[in-house]
Amino acid sequence: MPKSPPRFLNSPLSDFFIKWMSRINTWMYRRNDGEGLGGTFQKIPVALLTTTGRKTGQPRVNPLYFLRDGGRVIVAASKGGAEKNPMWYLNLKANPKVQVQIKKEVLDLTARDATDEERAEYWPQLVTMYPSYQDYQSWTDRTIPIVVCEP
């Protein structure tokens, strides 16, 4: 049974906040080439994930915490533990071709859900990197997807 999430988590206010904070962080990231402000948040490295909007066909950019595993980039579709998956996750399910920017490096990758074995490997690493992921999982009935982006 999930813990009680923050009251605003599944409200339109939360979506508005996430949208605008993502835009601000993306702007800072690009302005600084992922160095310093914008390139990390709470001392955790940030990458920019670009998906194609499933309805608009337009590029959609989201700053996300990430892990590297060789040529792979691993991200969690947490949306802060909200009831629904983030829009970027729905976009990559419709079109798995993504671009990931890590500092000045831009990678053209293909995204997919982690296998059960990969999930068992990556989830503990994600939680070690950002312990709030464990809280996020406790706030929702959905299993937070782990996305593997690979060449």
Curated annotation (Swiss-Prot):
Changing residue 76 to G: Loss of PA-824 reductase activity. Coiled coil: none annotated. The lineage of its organism: Bacteria, Bacillati, Actinomycetota, Actinomycetes, Mycobacteriales. It catalyses: oxidized coenzyme F420-(gamma-L-Glu)(n) + a quinol + H(+) = reduced coenzyme F420-(gamma-L-Glu)(n) + a quinone. GO terms for cellular component: peptidoglycan-based cell wall; plasma membrane. Coenzyme F420-(gamma-Glu)n binds at residues 54-56, 60-65, 76-79, 87-91, 133. This is Deazaflavin-dependent nitroreductase. It is a peripheral membrane protein. Belongs to the F420H(2)-dependent quinone reductase family. Changing residue 133 to A/F/L: Loss of PA-824 reductase activity. It is an enzyme of class 1 (oxidoreductase). InterPro entries: F420H2_quin_Rdtase, Split_barrel_FMN-bd. PANTHER family: DEAZAFLAVIN-DEPENDENT NITROREDUCTASE, F420H(2)-DEPENDENT QUINONE REDUCTASE RV1261C. It is found in: Cell membrane. Changing residue 65 to A/L: Loss of PA-824 and menadione reductase activity. One of its GO terms (molecular function) is coenzyme F420 binding. SUPFAM superfamilies: FMN-binding split barrel. Changing residue 136 to L/V: Loss of PA-824 reductase activity. It comes from Mycobacterium tuberculosis (strain ATCC 25618 / H37Rv). Optimum pH is 7.0-8.0.
